[in-house]
Amino acid sequence: MTIQGADRGGLFIRVIPPEISGGFRFDVLPRDLSHLQLLEGVSECEALSRLRRLFSLCGIAQERIAIKALEAAHGKGENNGCFDEEVFRESLVESLRSLLLPLAGDPLLPMSSTASWQRLGLLGKKQNSNFLSDFRFFLEEDLLGEDPAIFLKRQTVQEWRHWLRNNKEKSPVAHRAEAFDSEGDIFLPRMSGLTLSDRRCADFVARALDDRTFLSAPHMNGDARETGSLSRIGDHSLVNDLWSAGFSRHARLAARLLELASFSGQDNARPFAEDDLGVLHSCRLGVGVGMAWGQTSRGLLVHRWDVQQGEVQDVRILAPTEWIFSPKGGPFSLWLAALGQRKKDLGSLRRLVVETLWLFDPCAPVGIVEAPSSAG
């Protein structure tokens, strides 16, 4: 995660000073997605080559979903859900990686994490049937500090606190979460989940992708949606108990950990439903226009490609970051709005924003910029 300077495609959080807003306030700026135009005006092969260079995070998912959209554009390969094991594995490894990432200047993570990074690197290269066995071992030794099956049985705030206390010396995630500033536990209302099981979702996204401005600030008829682990596993008792108690940041972290732990009891990739990680969908929207989508580690990823006479005319990509950080009431935007009501110094507020970015897990560089110090 980069918190200094963001290029095209990056995410910017603006700080509005007290003389303008009456107190420090943060908001999310619409994301500049003009870099997607680099995929247009070239052949499909060249566009896919450029796509690989543009997206380093979840690169397999980006490429596979793009290929599915292109196949659908040519009237081939339309389906209501197929499981892609490589996308599934990439999603699990990416979830682990993002949870272990150190924050900028973060003194909290134990220094013994070098071996964890080495094991994670090896896990990301696994291509055999031992993947889930090695994944389970990594969860216990490097992430949770305890058997994932035991972690899955935790149901209450008290049991969560018990895990934090008992494992803060073994788990870098527990170590960081145990030190959460209580000021950051701002109560937020539950948001509707963005799931494929709602059949309206695909139709809505298809219509919404017709509007380029929507890509930078998506919403569903004014109602922004939750995506990622919290929308997929948000009904777990532990998540509900933490949320009901007002610990929204802890609930978000618990959902991410519970989802990972839920895969630990499998000997093979589990039977899939349409909202599972690694399940890809596609459909043809018109002559030369195809759309594909699927659940990745951070949430719903959608591609729409328009190809005419062998040349890519238009590419629209709606990524989880746009849903989560939507200026139009996305989960992170709501949290920032609530944070702005707190009377703290700018340094403390910045630290809290950086700390919470780790939970919301953007898939783009992040820059924090300041608005002019006067209304002029």
Locate each region found by the language model.
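Active-site bordering "gate/hinge" segments
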Residues: 1-298, 319-376
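Short, acidic, Ser/Thr-enriched surface-loop or helix-capping motifs
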Residues: 307
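Mixed-charge (Asp/Glu-Lys/Arg
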Residues: 310
